[in-house]
């Protein structure tokens, strides 16, 4: 599944996202949500080189993360 813009109803709900992390050189799964709890918005976009990207709030580490490329999102 490619990263796509999340619907408004999905933006505040918790989800699990699995994607290949170059930093860790393996597939990782994180618990996150689209927006930060204080209301700061996450975003999804296509990079200049055509790679889909999703910036989301990591609920376990309480920080922003960016998933790039193919990702699987489940609620």
Which stretches of residues belong to each language-model region?
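Short, surface-exposed linear segments at secondary-structure transitions and domain or protein termini
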Residues: 36-46, 73-75
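Mixed-charge, Lys/Arg-rich low-complexity intrinsically disordered regions
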Residues: 1-7
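A short, compositionally biased
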Residues: 8-16, 48-54
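Hydrophobic beta-strand positions
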Residues: 19-20, 45, 56-57
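Short acidic, Pro/Gly- and aromatic-enriched capping/linker segments at domain boundaries
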Residues: 11-23, 28, 33-39
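Acidic, low-complexity intrinsically disordered segments
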Residues: 49-75
């Amino acid at each position: 599944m490619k990263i796509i813009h999340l619907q408004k109803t999905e933006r505040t709900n918790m989800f699990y996202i699995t994607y290949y992390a170059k930093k860790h050189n393996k597939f990782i799964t994180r618990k996150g949500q689209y927006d930060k709890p204080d209301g700061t918005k996450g975003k999804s976009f296509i990079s200049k080189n055509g790679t889909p990207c999703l910036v989301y709030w990591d609920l376990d580490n309480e920080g922003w993360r960016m998933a790039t490329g193919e990702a699987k999102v489940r609620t």
